[in-house]
Amino acid sequence: MFYNPAMSFTRDLDVAVLRVAAGEKRRRLQVWEALAASGIRSVRWLNETDAVAGLVATELNPEALGYLQRNLRPWDRARVLCQDARHPELSERFDWVDLDPYGTPAPFLPAAVERLELGGILSVTATDTAVLAGPERKSCLQRYGARPLRTYLCREAGLRILLAHLASVAGQAGRGIHPLLCYVRDHHFRVYLRLTAPGGTPPLGEVPFPGYPGPPIPEGLRGGPLWTGPLFDPDFLGRVEVPASAEQGPSVGAWLSLLQEESAVDRLFYYEVGEVCSGLGLAQPPRRERIFASLRDAGWAVARTHLDPAGFRTDAPWSAVAGRFRELSALR
């Protein structure tokens, strides 16, 4: 009930990202795990890093609270509080705030942003995938103020809807956001972002917008508002290393390599080979290596995407992608 072994991958990544965050500050961090449950994240941060100066773990469930208190007892730096993360009675601000709810993080975001230092990092999980990227359109409008995009792009659109909502919550607090590392994996969305001073209008919009250059979206279909800016900070991502203590070290390492490749091509939405062929009426899809080589030979950047093994991200417009596919198909 209070420990999910399937999320050990994410906790491995948390350890790695926390170390980078502390390295940037050149000091140990003040951390708040807002929905701590058994406190496994806090235990790993305290046990596997030297990045934590002080930690507050809050939990409202009385049964979980007992586990949490026992698990964090060895560390004087850790405080356990029975509090509602939506309305915490906390006076301090934190360098790192983590939200890992069951379902939507939306009710907890205002308090998390309020308690986060300027320049601090907010890490957020959302598991309401049927809302952000599925058929529950009404719930998405109610929770996030956006319409999901019901195409093969739904998962990326869901991630960007979550970021747009985070930008809106931060904006209401007079702050901005800077995404560091954002991804979709299995049944969850995960976002690491930095809280910034406001810097003009955030990159938000509905798709398709005038001049939209990406993969075709069926006529009459609209999605958003969503985040149209980068999903990654390549410099930050390049400093994230697999911790020696990782439970899923090889998987985390391969994932980071894939995200680093993807971060080099900053474009809204990816192409999926089968969808491109279907849209163009091509019977046989070209091999991915030939697609990549053809686009690169024409001067375009191209990279794999973590969102789909048959997907790729490129700075080439749809017209160029379509032209390359037709040429490759004619050569078969």
List where the protein language model places each region.
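SAM-dependent transferase fold signal centered on methyltransferase-like domains
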Residues: 1-332
